[in-house]
């Protein structure tokens, strides 16, 4: 059960990261504030 939960959590966080990259990272102000976008710092 723990293994399945860990896999689900990983998939969820991965999907969330992709959503943030795809949506937030389309907007320069959001890119600047979000390290997931690879913002220049």
UniProtKB/Swiss-Prot annotation:
Compartments where located: Secreted
Please provide the record's free-text comment about the domains of this protein: The cysteine framework is I (CC-C-C). Alpha4/6 pattern.
Say yes or no: keyword Disulfide bond present: yes
The record's misc note reads: Negative results: does not inhibit human alpha-7/CHRNA7 and alpha-9-alpha-10/CHRNA9-CHRNA10 acetylcholine receptors (when tested at 3 uM).
Covalent S-S links between cysteines: 24-30, 25-37
Report the source organism. Answer: Conus pulicarius
Name of a matching Pfam family: Toxin_8
Q: Can you name one GO molecular function term for this protein? A: ion channel regulator activity
What is this protein's name? Alpha-conotoxin-like Pu1.2
């Amino acid at each position: 059960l723990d293994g399945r939960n860990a896999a689900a959590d990983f998939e969820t966080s991965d999907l969330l990261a992709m959503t943030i990259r795809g949506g937030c990272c389309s907007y320069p102000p959001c890119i600047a504030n979000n390290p997931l976008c690879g913002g220049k710092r």
